[in-house]
């Protein structure tokens, strides 16, 4: 597997300070400054501190940074770095998939991307890129690329192979791609280890491409590979990439959710939202703990854990929202499911729990607010637009980002109130990251910092 590493200007300073990176990162994380994985600390999608309410294409933008490719993965923030993944070039796709465009049209592609897209052998041109930018200024710090290698899965036109959001434990960054390739990088961008799950285990054949992101637990990187044929849950050693445990999950369990690790009353639990049911495992060993739920088609939302309950939406069409207490064993349907709300569930965006209320939006911009204690609907409000990004909350506000670049800022509470509608003329599928009072939005081709 070929690899490329391109340090940007200023990376020498980063390398010289590598010995103290862990301490600096820990200090920032303790102050609530990091957003180290999909949906931030604890995957809760909640930020602390004061956050901006209004911005536009010309106001409130701290910086913009062009990306080295396209993708729908969300940014993460580790110390003074904002890290994001992208795809350069086009991948051959299996029958039944749809080829995503690199951006809205060829005019928006850089000369390099256009040349790659026109290459006679697109598989040779395909690159997966991990980039780091200075959190305060947007200056590029480093870029690492690896060659994309098949087998290549089916894809939906809304995304490409750079869909999983990277994760970090404060020492390394783990970037996963839709072929099954995963790379671990130091915070200086230097490669530590790589694996290709699509060739080592089985080709990735999740319907519409792979969307699940890595979850970090202690010294493990946990990966959900729910596919139409061989589905499995895998834990790799964070330092070496070696397999620590693997659980086969059968066939036909297609899902795109990201596993969530929580502290339950009887020990830590690893939660998985899949088409067959909801499962909890011991994250240290992969042992099954409990399960519940009936079959649903292709769940995408990830679970959230707040106030002693697990909340999640089950996915495609006429689905429901559940509140589950952890700590059970075996089938917990009759013992630990506190409530089920039959409508208002989101298909793609995940739920955010904020100050006792659940907020969710469907793909057509209808926001539903539910009482987290009872499951009773508090209100519904139509924003309009198309939504794939998951909402985030903080500073008494809830943020919803539409595909067409509108961010609706709602006042958190029992009455719907839109505080602002902020427009950026770009396409957004990725969910926001928040750190140090800044909101980071990733479009098709740009990383934007709002402050």
Please name every model-derived segment.
Residues 15-26:
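Bacterial N-terminal signal peptides
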Residues 13-14, 40:
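Hydrophobic alpha-helical segments, especially transmembrane helices
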Residues 1-12:
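N-terminal secretory signal peptides that target proteins for export/translocation
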Residues 2-3, 17, 84, 188:
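Short intrinsically disordered, low-complexity coil segments enriched in acidic
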Residues 28-451:
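Noncatalytic, solvent-exposed loop/strand surfaces
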Residues 7, 16-17, 43, 446:
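General helical structural elements
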């Amino acid at each position: 597997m070929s690899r490329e590493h391109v340090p940007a200007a200023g990376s020498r300073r980063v390398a010289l300070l590598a010995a103290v990176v862990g301490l600096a990162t820990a200090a920032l994380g303790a102050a609530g400054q990091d957003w180290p994985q999909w949906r931030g600390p604890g995957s809760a999608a909640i930020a602390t501190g004061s956050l901006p309410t209004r911005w536009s294409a010309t106001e409130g933008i701290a910086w913009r940074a062009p990306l080295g490719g396209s993708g729908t993965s969300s940014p993460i923030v580790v110390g003074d770095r904002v890290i994001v993944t992208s795809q350069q070039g086009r991948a051959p796709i299996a029958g039944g998939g749809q080829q995503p465009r690199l951006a809205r049209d060829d005019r928006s592609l850089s000369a390099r991307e256009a040349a790659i897209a026109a290459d006679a052998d697109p598989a040779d041109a395909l690159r997966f890129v991990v980039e780091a930018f200075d959190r305060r200024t947007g200056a590029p710090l480093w870029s690492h690329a690896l060659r994309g290698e098949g087998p290549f899965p089916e894809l939906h036109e809304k995304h490409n192979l750079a869909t999983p959001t990277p994760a970090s434990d404060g020492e390394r960054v783990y970037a996963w791609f839709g072929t099954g390739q995963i790379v671990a990088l130091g915070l200086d961008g230097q490669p530590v280890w790589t694996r290709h799950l699509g060739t080592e285990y089985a080709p990735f054949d999740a319907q519409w491409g792979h969307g699940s992101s890595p979850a970090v637990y202690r010294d493990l990187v946990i990966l959900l590979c729910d596919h139409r044929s061989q589905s499995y849950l895998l834990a790799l050693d964070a330092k070496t990439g070696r397999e620590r445990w693997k659980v086969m999950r059968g066939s036909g369990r297609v899902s795109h959710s990201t596993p969530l690790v929580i502290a339950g009353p009887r020990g830590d639990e690893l939660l998985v939202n899949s088409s067959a049911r909801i499962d909890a495992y011991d994250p240290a060993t992969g042992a099954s703990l409990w399960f519940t739920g009936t079959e649903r088609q292709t769940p995408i939302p990830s679970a959230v854990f707040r106030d002693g309950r697990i909340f999640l939406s089950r996915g495609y069409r006429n689905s429901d929202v559940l509140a589950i207490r952890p700590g059970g064993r075996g089938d917990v349907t009759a013992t630990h499911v506190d409530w089920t709300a039959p409508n208002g569930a989101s298909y793609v965006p995940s739920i955010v729990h904020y100050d006792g209320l659940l907020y969710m939006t469907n793909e057509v911009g209808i926001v539903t607010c539910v009482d987290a204690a009872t499951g009773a609907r508090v209100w519904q409000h139509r924003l309009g637009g198309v939504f794939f990004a998951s909402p985030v909350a903080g500073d008494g506000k809830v943020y919803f980002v539409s595909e067409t670049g509108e961010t609706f800022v709602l006042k958190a509470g029992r009455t719907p109130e839109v505080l602002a509608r902020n427009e950026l003329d770009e396409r957004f599928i990725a969910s926001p990251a928040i750190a140090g009072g800044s909101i980071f939005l990733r479009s098709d081709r740009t990383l934007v910092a709002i402050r």
